[in-house]
């Protein structure tokens, strides 16, 4: 019994053994080669960050997920990164300091204080690619196409691409900002789970049910392209800003040249893992997984360059999750 305790790993942490360790390494190399050949520069950000600078405009949210401790050398608080995409945005804004379009890619370990409810994992290997300084729809299209190509290159078949718009969700949730942070988080959680019963319970004491009905509408607005037209009716009270989000999704779909093997799914109530996205959001699934293998979206303004919000879009994937579903002979 004592010997088992000596080598037991922390909850939510695993180690890679043969042959899986080599399989993951081969997939990692394949991704780096794909990204570099596509015009992205490879970076290796540090595992540790100063807590006070972690996350930029999303500092508080990232800190919720980060393991933090005091540095005995300096006395400052340090955090283990829970996400690499925000590190890429820091490198773009403060190390590269370019007004031009910058494309960065990475593969590395991330550790989260909060355990994933799906994978029960707090430590994984995150791979991704980001585009900075380009606010065009072309950048969104490129990011989505590269995400799909990434998964296909890793031997995943039967992909479904899910599209949503964080701006649309934000417009609806803005109507509940007077409820306090805790209740707002509960509403976000209920929306992400599409739990109409929880939304009704959380808002049972509200006399004006119009806002509740909008939230419930978001829960139900998923499916094929027809969802966009239905949303124009169900969400028309939100005004022109919401219509612009829907128009953008319509234009984006037309611009995407999707492989016939990739199914398209709209989910207008989708909420990503981190809440710093503020434009189009996207994710990729396979039926056998039951959860997204890759997520991404637009997150303009996470960092600022010369006090000007820096446009950004990108995606990341969980390499340890992907290796379980690859069809490659590795």
Predicted regions: what they are:
Residues 42, 158, 180-181, 260:
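Residue-level detector of short coil/turn "hinge" positions at structural boundaries
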Residues 154-170, 179, 186:
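Extended alpha-helical scaffolds
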Residues 43, 162, 265-267:
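General small-molecule cofactor/ligand-binding pocket signal
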Residues 45-64, 164-174, 270-278:
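Beta-rich nucleic-acid/ligand-interaction surfaces
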Residues 65-73, 178-201:
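Acidic, His- and aromatic-enriched active-site or binding-groove loops in soluble protein domains
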Residues 1-12, 173-174, 182, 189-190:
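General N-terminal leader/first-domain-start detector
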Residues 20-38, 49-50, 85-98, 104-157, ...:
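Positively charged, Gly/Ser-enriched RNA/tRNA-binding surfaces
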């Amino acid at each position: 019994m004592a010997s088992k305790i000596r080598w037991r790993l922390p909850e939510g942490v695993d180690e890679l053994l043969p042959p899986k360790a080599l399989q993951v390494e081969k997939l990692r190399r394949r991704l780096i080669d794909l990204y570099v050949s596509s015009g992205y520069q490879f970076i290796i950000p540090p595992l540790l960050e100063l807590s006070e600078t972690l996350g930029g405009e999303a500092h508080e949210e990232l800190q919720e997920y980060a393991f933090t401790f005091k540095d005995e050398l300096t006395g400052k608080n340090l955090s283990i990164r829970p996400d690499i995409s925000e590190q890429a945005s820091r490198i773009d804004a403060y190390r590269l300091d370019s007004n031009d379009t910058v494309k960065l890619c990475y593969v590395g370990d991330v550790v989260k204080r909060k355990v994933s409810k799906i994978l029960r994992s707090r430590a994984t290997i995150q791979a991704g690619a980001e585009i900075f300084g380009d606010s065009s729809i072309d950048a969104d299209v490129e990011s989505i196409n590269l995400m799909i190509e990434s998964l296909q290159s890793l031997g995943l078949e039967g992909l479904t691409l899910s599209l949503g718009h964080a701006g649309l969700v934000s417009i609806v949730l803005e109507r509940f900002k007077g409820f306090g942070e805790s209740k707002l988080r509960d509403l976000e959680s209920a929306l992400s789970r599409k739990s109409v019963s929880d939304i009704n319970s959380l808002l049972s004491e509200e006399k004006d049910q119009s806002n509740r009905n909008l939230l419930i509408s978001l829960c139900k607005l998923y499916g094929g392209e027809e969802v966009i037209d239905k949303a124009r009716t169900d969400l028309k009270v939100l005004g022109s800003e919401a219509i612009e989000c829907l128009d953008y999704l319509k234009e984006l779909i037309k611009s995407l040249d999707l492989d016939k093997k990739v199914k398209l799914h709209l989910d207008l109530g989708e909420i990503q893992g981190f809440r710093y996205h503020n434009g189009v959001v996207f994710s990729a699934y396979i039926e056998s997984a039951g959860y997204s293998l890759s997520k991404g979206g637009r997150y303009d303004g996470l960092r600022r360059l010369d006090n000007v919000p820096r446009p950004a879009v990108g995606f990341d994937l969980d390499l340890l999750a992907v290796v379980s579903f690859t069809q490659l002979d590795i």
